[in-house]
């Protein structure tokens, strides 16, 4: 009869092999998901091509984009003349001519084009080539003001109506809408105007009857759909326009929309058949990078200042912040260290916003430190860097905000600082949104990924097929020459669940910070669990592990609402039950090391030349002197943003 020790040894061997098999299953499952995603995208494209082919056989014009990329339509001569003599442009960008031809033919079209691709021209130019006026629906007054400023410089007659418009101005616009001799070509309104102003709708009817109202342009059309990243209820009322004015052609524009969102928007706008032109999401001149956000504020500012004084010396940029308070504090810190910076957020007085915008456009200010209120319609071509002080609330938002860099098609950098605490600051803000948390976790997954091409991650989100080799080492992950492996972190999850169960029994709620403290053997003694050994990993890597468990649903967020704030707590998630199976394994990708280590690399740029480093070192001298005084006054130690190599417990 076999001895107990021999049986135990065999059992351990089987358990070990089961863990290895579980890890292989997870790797294969990930690969399966990638292939399923590619299959879905390709199937949709084939279906779209077949539908376009069928539609082309029965329509007056072929519905494939290539068929509309022509200059032999009745309006083509006028279109070219307006392009060159009014807009002062010599040629169209990709999909602009196709979209213009479709809308000039009186057909409905949706255009999905990256930020900076020139969507505005696709309805502004046709407005000048058509009789009557085009009604433009925009979500933000600031966006309308930006566009009107540019149109005025080009000598194009355009105006807007909003709640602050004077009675005299409203009266003039209403008269121009039905005046057959009017030169007014573009009228900008917010969706609220359509939803709530019966007087304006009445005026539109009269203009339509007089054949003066010829086209509807819905900017940021993704706002129609509750599945979009920026859903606005008043956009749902826009369906009335096609019902009331069926002969006015409609063009919808967005930089960020999935197929699901576009289909939903089409239904909401009451469009039966619609062309959809989608430009590639790829901006080949943009370099994407994710950096570990230093926990120390002084370290963080040091990192940013070294970049601005080094690689971006004398170059224009934007720093996006989570809140108005962050925007103002970062601006003050940068100014104290000699950077010409200006804050921009929604609560600034209109004249202050205009001043900051004007000075930045004229390069009198090097950096705008802004909230998301800054950017829509911003058309500064030479923005060399966009830095995210905190991550965006969704992939769509990040794509749009980072896309404000490099509109001149020259190389530009998009650097995102990822910090654990930001997850919960943002989740508390988006908790009431329909898919807010889901979209945030997609963004967290993007930031946590240390190996996949950033463009591949974006492509998967926007339903595109992408070959990582086409990135040309224009993202941090594609620049790495490290090897990666999957580490088994199952026991960490079991320990965290023990801590959360004990807290639940004590009727205690644990914030993410309290959970980490308890795990590390710190904080209140009653929240610690006997038998849970504190891991020897640094705190920032424990944060990454908890974030991994959160987006994999082994943990979940719960919220408490107070009069002043929404507080996020962590609880046991729906997938935690899988741990009842002893063989179940949870793995996390880490950088492979020759030693038995758990190493999470902070991303480093690879595209910049050696001169960048020298420039940063050269220009950091003044910074160090100024920073030393600031740090001495605050009594804080400047430890620097370090790359860490972590020994696995």
From Swiss-Prot:
Residue ranges of the region described as Disordered: 597-649
CC annotations in GO: chromosome; cytoplasm; nucleus
Sequence positions that bind Zn(2+): 453, 471, 475, 478
Compositionally biased intervals (Basic residues): 640-649
Keywords assigned by UniProt, alphabetized: Acetylation, ATP-binding, DNA-binding, Helicase, Hydrolase, Isomerase, Metal-binding, Nucleotide-binding, Nucleus, Phosphoprotein, Zinc
Function: DNA helicase that plays a role in DNA damage repair and genome stability. Exhibits a magnesium- and ATP-dependent DNA-helicase activity that unwinds single- and double-stranded DNA in a 3'-5' direction. Plays a role in restoring regressed replication forks. Required to restart stalled replication forks induced by abortive topoisomerase 1 and 2 lesions. May play a role in the repair of DNA that is damaged by ultraviolet light or other mutagens.
Name the UniProt record assigns to this protein: ATP-dependent DNA helicase Q1
Taxonomic lineage of the native organism: Eukaryota, Metazoa, Chordata, Craniata, Vertebrata
